[in-house]
């Protein structure tokens, strides 16, 4: 145990350049690379981020395109957003454009279904 304490003390006293040199020497002697564990750690860190994205509860509904039935899409947009006819038409004409934000998943899916039934292309973000 005393030997480990000595090694720890010696390693702690190394400069950054000396530590980098030591790493290179050990890599050559043992035939390993210090880069491999870093790549594994990075891949492991990406997994929780993917889980967080999968657990998303609020969505933004983005109207991507009106499709062939523009009048039907305008009517549905008007009903969903509560906008006037002119504002709803403007929103549809300016697609792709966010239509509604902070919408719960069930409501977002329902709205997406209505818009797609009218002929629109919609994305949930």
Curated annotation (Swiss-Prot):
Entries under InterPro entries matching the protein: Ribosomal_bL12, Ribosomal_bL12_C, Ribosomal_bL12_C/ClpS-like, Ribosomal_bL12_oligo, Ribosomal_bL12_oligo_N_sf
Pfam family, one: Ribosomal_L12
MF GO annotations: mRNA binding; structural constituent of ribosome
Assigned GO CC terms: cytoplasm; ribonucleoprotein complex; ribosome
Keyword check for S-adenosyl-L-methionine: no
Gene3D superfamilies: 3.30.1390.10, Single helix bin (1.20.5.710)
Keywords: Ribonucleoprotein, Ribosomal protein
Coiled-coil parts of chain: none
Keyword DNA-binding among record annotations: no
GO biological process: one example: translation
Function (record text): Forms part of the ribosomal stalk which helps the ribosome interact with GTP-bound translation factors. Is thus essential for accurate translation.
NCBIfam families with a match to the protein in the record: L12
Similarity field: Belongs to the bacterial ribosomal protein bL12 family.
Assembly mode: Homodimer. Part of the ribosomal stalk of the 50S ribosomal subunit. Forms a multimeric L10(L12)X complex, where L10 forms an elongated spine to which 2 to 4 L12 dimers bind in a sequential fashion. Binds GTP-bound translation factors.
Protein name as catalogued: Large ribosomal subunit protein bL12
Species the sequence originates in: Rickettsia felis (strain ATCC VR-1525 / URRWXCal2) (Rickettsia azadi)
Source species taxonomy: Bacteria, Pseudomonadati, Pseudomonadota, Alphaproteobacteria, Rickettsiales
């Amino acid at each position: 145990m005393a030997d480990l304490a000595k090694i720890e003390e010696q390693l702690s006293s190394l400069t950054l350049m000396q530590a980098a040199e030591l790493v290179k020497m050990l890599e050559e002697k043992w035939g390993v690379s210090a880069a491999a564990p870093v790549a594994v750690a990075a891949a492991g860190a990406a997994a929780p981020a993917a889980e967080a994205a999968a657990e998303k509860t609020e969505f933004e509904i983005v109207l991507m395109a009106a499709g062939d039935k523009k009048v039907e899409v305008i009517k549905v947009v008007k009903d969903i957003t509560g906008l006037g006819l002119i504002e709803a038409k403007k929103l549809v004409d300016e697609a792709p454009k966010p239509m509604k934000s902070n919408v719960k998943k069930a409501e977002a899916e329902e709205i997406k279904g209505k818009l797609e039934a009218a002929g629109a292309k919609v994305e949930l973000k």
